[in-house]
Amino acid sequence: MIVPPNSAAPSSSLVPAGSAARSTVQGYDPKLHDPYFDGLSGQLADKGFVTAAADDLITWARTGSLMWMTFGLACCAVEMMHSAMPRYDLERYGFAPRASPRQSDVMIVAGTLTNKMAPALRKVYDQMPEPRYVISMGSCANGGGYYYYSYSVVRGCDRIVPIDIYVPGCPPTAEALVYGVLQLQKKIRRTGTIER
């Protein structure tokens, strides 16, 4: 950009921190902005340290380091895999995959749950340490979906394990799952207990 000698060049230092300049940051979405972190960052900027209860600190740490285990049963599992790939990248929200239920905090049930698979789902859920959370992904996992009247389908995985977040769709998009994960993080922050 060529600036005439008599005019002032636009300066980003004239914009106060945290105002309109924030919207120009790549990847910032005001809909996903959390006022909880505004309070912490304001307190940190004023004093140089943060005072909080141990429960608040543990809850804050838990929301940023959730380990999820896949329980992909049908076509929804493909969209679940998309959400972990570079385009959506769930790990940037502190949501990393694990292969074992013993190291997982969250289980994503994606797809049609059959009667034969229901005991395995419950067994895997019981192996997860407390506090544990479950996301039901897709119409089939939520309520039976297209196969509702089949003799071999469980009409919703909430009959087997308690569900925290329902992600609707057939199949739901990867964006819907990312939104469900963000809602789970907000729910954990809101309830904020060490034991569930």
UniProtKB/Swiss-Prot annotation:
Its EC number is 7.1.1.-. GO terms for molecular function: 4 iron, 4 sulfur cluster binding; iron ion binding; NADH dehydrogenase (ubiquinone) activity; NADH:ubiquinone reductase (non-electrogenic) activity; quinone binding. It catalyses: a quinone + NADH + 5 H(+)(in) = a quinol + NAD(+) + 4 H(+)(out). It is found in: Cell inner membrane. GO terms for cellular component: plasma membrane; respiratory chain complex I. InterPro entries: NADH_UbQ_OxRdtase-like_20kDa, NADH_UQ_OxRdtase_20Kd_su. The keyword Cell membrane applies. Keywords: 4Fe-4S, Cell inner membrane, Cell membrane, Iron, Iron-sulfur, Membrane, Metal-binding, NAD, Quinone, Translocase, Transport, Ubiquinone. Binds 1 [4Fe-4S] cluster. The keyword Transcription regulation does not apply. One of its GO terms (biological process) is electron transport coupled proton transport. Its cofactor is [4Fe-4S] cluster. [4Fe-4S] cluster binds at residues 75-76, 140, 170. NDH-1 shuttles electrons from NADH, via FMN and iron-sulfur (Fe-S) centers, to quinones in the respiratory chain. Couples the redox reaction to proton translocation (for every two electrons transferred, four hydrogen ions are translocated across the cytoplasmic membrane), and thus conserves the redox energy in a proton gradient. NDH-1 is composed of 14 different subunits. Subunits NuoB, C, D, E, F, and G constitute the peripheral sector of the complex. This is NADH-quinone oxidoreductase subunit B.
